[in-house]
């Protein structure tokens, strides 16, 4: 495995319509609804049923009709056309959302949620946006990155409080961000470096509005 300072083409992969990255792995969605992954696989984040690294794309086991994807630190997330969420990889903090803390080398369904329009991955947490504009979150919550007003880890989904009419979501390592339909930006979680954008360096377990934007 050789590093490259210039772009190299991923071999054997075509008709790709979306791409996502984890910390050391990559996820691709093809137009036929299948998902392909490559890179580090120590926690099963490639979803091929093994924990063997792969330098070429492998198909995620048993996953079809996928419409959107996201990458977390060591886990992967997908939404199927029926609006259900599926996730695989590291699950130490419940970031797969299946109610357990057991890693999974194949996709497992995240419980409770349907009608999902978008997903995002953080370092050890996950976010989902429902078609009604509400955000749900699960996984590690040591800095309040789930936005439920606590710092309690969650193995199943909790609603991000005080936020409605959301249009877009994103996850950082230990914080989360959302855009409302009115164009305002909101953030929550770790803030020691000011990443919440609210003119403080105080962590927040509930969403705060990003200032001057």
Regions inferred by a protein language model and the residue ranges of each:
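Short glycine/serine- and acidic-residue-enriched loop/turn motifs that recur at repeat junctions
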Residues: 1-6, 38-56, 88-106, 136-156, ...
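Glycine-centered flexibility motif
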Residues: 12-15, 22, 39, 47, ...
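Beta-rich catalytic cores
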Residues: 3, 15, 22-23, 53, ...
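Conserved core positions of repeat-based scaffolds
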Residues: 25-28, 37, 75-78, 87, ...
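Tandem repeat domain/solenoid detector
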Residues: 11-18, 31-34, 56-68, 81-84, ...
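Short coil/turn segments that connect the beta-strands within blades of beta-propeller domains
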Residues: 24, 33, 73-74, 83, ...
């Amino acid at each position: 495995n050789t590093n490259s300072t210039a772009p190299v083409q991923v071999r054997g992969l075509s008709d790709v319509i979306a791409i996502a990255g984890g910390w050391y792995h990559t996820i691709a969605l093809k137009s036929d609804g299948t998902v392909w992954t490559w890179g580090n696989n120590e926690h099963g984040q490639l979803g091929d049923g093994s924990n063997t690294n792969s330098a070429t794309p492998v198909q995620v086991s048993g996953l079809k009709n996928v419409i959107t994807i996201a990458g977390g630190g060591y886990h992967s997330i997908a939404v199927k056309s029926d609006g259900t969420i599926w996730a695989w990889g590291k699950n130490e903090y419940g970031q797969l959302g299946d109610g357990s803390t057991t890693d999974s080398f194949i996709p497992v369904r995240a419980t409770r949620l349907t009608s999902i329009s978008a997903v995002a991955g953080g370092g050890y947490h996950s976010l989902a946006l429902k078609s009604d504009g509400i955000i749900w979150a699960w996984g590690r919550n040591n800095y309040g990155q789930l936005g439920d007003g606590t710092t309690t880890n969650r193995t199943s989904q909790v609603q991000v409080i005080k936020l409605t009419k959301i249009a877009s979501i994103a996850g950082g390592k230990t914080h989360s961000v959302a855009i409302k339909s009115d164009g305002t930006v909101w953030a929550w979680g770790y803030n020691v470096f000011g990443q919440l954008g609210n003119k403080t360096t105080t962590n927040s377990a509930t969403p705060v509005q990003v200032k001057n934007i």
